[in-house]
């Protein structure tokens, strides 16, 4: 049947991007377009719930915002989940963010989802699902302790 992790992103404890993992495979990631009219500081929490059936180790995450590398910290690791966090400062009206475990160009074109977040109008949209089934939860009601950003 193949390996399938679960991958979610929590943004500022208010927005959840759910099911960003591929339908099958050991890779996870997405492309975000964030629109903002002023400076914003976003705290992102990346939650990976691994499928241990065919792997021994979870791949790390790489994050780029407008082609600049973003520091990602592993903050928690259990058998059930791995949590990374990053802080992104939005200075431009439009910010492109790439989040991935494998940066193969083909994955961004045809597999990883593409999501648009308009912070001005509070309109959030999945632009392209590709090889995943993402959805956006806003406002976020954390149903697991590790989803809370306190």
Swiss-Prot record:
Record flagged with keyword Repeat: no
Any one GO biological process: viral process
Protein's name in the database: Interferon antagonist OPG027
Reported function: Inhibits antiviral activity induced by type I interferons. Does not block signal transduction of IFN, but is important to counteract the host antiviral state induced by a pre-treatment with IFN.
Short name of any one Pfam family annotated for the protein: Pox_C7_F8A
UniProt keyword Transmembrane present: no
Swiss-Prot/TrEMBL keywords: Early protein, Host-virus interaction, Inhibition of host innate immune response by virus, Viral immunoevasion
The organism of origin for this protein: Monkeypox virus
Domain of life: Viruses
Similarity field: Belongs to the orthopoxvirus OPG027 family.
Inducing stimuli: Expressed in the early phase of the viral replicative cycle.
């Amino acid at each position: 049947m193949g390996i399938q992790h679960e991958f979610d992103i929590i943004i500022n404890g208010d927005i959840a991007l759910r099911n960003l993992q591929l339908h099958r495979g050991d890779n996870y990631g997405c492309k975000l377009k964030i629109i903002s009219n002023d400076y914003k500081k976003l705290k992102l929490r990346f939650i990976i719930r691994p499928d241990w059936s065919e792997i021994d180790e979870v791949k790390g995450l790489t994050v780029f915002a407008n082609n600049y590398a973003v520091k990602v910290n592993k903050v928690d690791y259990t058998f059930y989940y791995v949590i990374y966090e990053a802080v992104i400062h939005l200075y431009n009206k439009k910010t492109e963010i790439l989040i991935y475990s494998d940066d193969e160009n083909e994955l961004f074109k045809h597999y990883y989802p593409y999501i648009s977040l308009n912070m001005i109008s509070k309109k959030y949209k999945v632009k392209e699902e590709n090889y995943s089934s993402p959805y956006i939860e806003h406002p976020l009601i954390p149903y697991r302790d590790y989803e809370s950003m306190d």
